[in-house]
Structures are given as structure tokens and as C-alpha cells.
Amino acid sequence: KQTLFSLLMCVLAIAGCDTQKQAIVGYELALTRAKQTLDSLYLNYSVSGTCLLRENYPSNIGEYTATYLASEEQKNMPNLYSYLWPYSGTFSAVNALFATTGDKEYKSVLDNKVLVGLEEYFDTRRTPEAYASYINSAPQSDRFYDDNVWLGIDFTDTYMLTKEPKYLQKAQLIWNFIE
């Protein structure tokens, strides 16, 4: 009985070690894929001279129409840049990479690329201030609660990671819009 128990413990220990190794390999693979996806996104969707992204790839600005828009008028207007909803996904993605790795490179990408582009959507013409669905240099666009809620969560997450008050202040501005 004691030999069988010892053998069982050895098998469980070995199986547990293998599971841990697989988890580490799975984590590293997922992290590599996340980094490659972010790099590919900026390689293929970036708009030269800006921190903004295109709506689609390959970019066919004259032919592309966003079928998810509220009106036919908006749908038929070509846009040089993505709408807020797809753009804001970069904020969540870079936040997740920063939180996972602790690599300050992602903080730099966040501050010098993602948030710079995001500010192009920040609408100060209406109160309370909030993020609009399209960039401010275009005609005034809608502001959606759900888009802003997700951004508020991302700003809060960034604040929790960095303890820098500027992120919390932005989350509070968004909350004023949601309220």
C-alpha cells in the first residue's frame, strides 16, 4: 500500500510539473502573439504623420463604407481614420500588455501613441466633455455611453497600474458624461 501511495504521489507530482510547464509555454505563446498582433496593427493600419489608425486594411478609402453607422448620410461619407470604437481597442490591448509584462515600453506606447491618437476624439465643444465617435476635425459626431464607459475602465486600469493622477482625472471626466 505504501509503495502504491508513493508511486501515485510521484505520478501526480510529475503530471503537475508538466501542467505547469505547459501553462508557461501557453503564456509565452499568447504573449508573443499579442505583441505580434499589436505590431501588425500599427504596421498595417497606421496613418502616416498621425497617431491615428485606418478603419480597414487594405485601405480603400474611396470605396469603404461603414455599415454599422446610424444614418445613410454618415455611411456614404469616406473616413480617413477609424471610428472611436475600433481605435479604443488599442488602449485596452496596450493596457493588457503593460499589466501583464510590466514593461515600460508599453507605458511609452500608451502615452506617446495610443492616448495621443485618442485625444483626437475628445469632444470639448459639448458639455460634459467626452469622447466622440469620430475625430474632432470632422463634423460633429455622436458620443456613445458604452464607448466612453470602456474608456473610463481603461483609464482606471492605467491609474491602478501607474498611480498617476492624470489617468484617474480622465476617468472622472468620463464619469461626469455617463452620470
Predicted regions and their residues:
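Catalytic-loop motifs flanking and including active-site residues across diverse enzymes
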Residues: 6, 86-89, 147
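A generic secondary-structure signal for well-formed alpha-helical elements
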Residues: 11, 159-162, 178
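C-terminal motif of bacterial Sec signal peptides marking the signal peptidase cleavage site
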Residues: 14-16
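Residue-level signature for tetratricopeptide repeat
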Residues: 97, 154, 158-161
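Low-complexity, Ser/Thr/Pro/Gly-enriched N-terminal "stalk/linker" regions
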Residues: 18-138, 165-179
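Mobile, glycine-rich extracellular loop/lid and propeptide segments
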Residues: 142-155, 164-174
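Intrinsic disorder/low-complexity segments enriched in polar/small residues
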Residues: 2-3, 21
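Sec-dependent N-terminal signal peptides
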Residues: 3-12
